[in-house]
């Protein structure tokens, strides 16, 4: 049974978890803006200073595989329609380089400014972390669930959670921190240039 977290709560990951499926889901509210919503999940592999060490430490729809294959994005869902996970990221903890101390899992709205969209128009957003046996196991056993209940009226990017290493143990931090400026703002925040 999964542990349900609230914003700011932290929990240790199961010691036996070698691979994790990170599933993200959401619904978009109907509105009369004329544009479809395209939300995108991404992951940033971070060093001790909270910054990416290399460009390939940024995993998103144009770079699906992170360094050493440690983090793999399962592809961009352009509509977010349907039940269940809208986008999935798989983490293989055995492949994460030693210098990586944290993985930030984020969601952004593609072309948010031009489309006049923000996270205030998104509902039922969640993240779940499941223990999986291999990269083909897309169900797994849920360990953690975090429902984002906060209202984000102007934000176009969210840091949903951080999976971080402390004293050799991987932990989960329910962050839910909003940004204006979309993906570009997150990229700069994590030490990369656009």
Each PLM stretch: what is its role?
Residues 1-194:
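Intrinsic-disorder/low-complexity signal
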């Amino acid at each position: 049974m999964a542990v349900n977290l609230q914003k700011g709560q932290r929990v240790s990951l199961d010691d036996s978890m070698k691979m994790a499926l990170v599933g993200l889901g959401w619904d978009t509210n109907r509105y009369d803006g004329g544009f479809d919503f395209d939300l995108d999940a991404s992951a940033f592999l971070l060093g001790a200073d909270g910054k990416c060490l290399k460009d390939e430490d940024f995993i998103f729809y144009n770079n699906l595989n992170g360094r050493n294959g440690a983090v793999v994005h399962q592809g961009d869902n352009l509509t977010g329609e349907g039940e269940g996970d809208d986008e999935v990221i798989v983490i293989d903890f055995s492949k994460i380089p030693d210098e990586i101390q944290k993985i930030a899992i984020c969601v952004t709205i593609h072309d948010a400014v031009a489309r006049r969209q923000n996270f205030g128009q998104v509902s039922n957003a969640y993240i779940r972390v499941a223990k999986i046996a291999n990269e083909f196991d897309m169900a797994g056993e849920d360990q953690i669930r975090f429902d984002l209940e906060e209202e984000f009226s102007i934000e176009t990017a969210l840091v949903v959670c951080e999976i971080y290493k402390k004293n050799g143990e991987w932990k989960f931090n329910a962050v839910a921190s909003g940004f204006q400026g979309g993906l570009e703002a997150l990229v700069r925040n994590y030490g990369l240039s656009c």
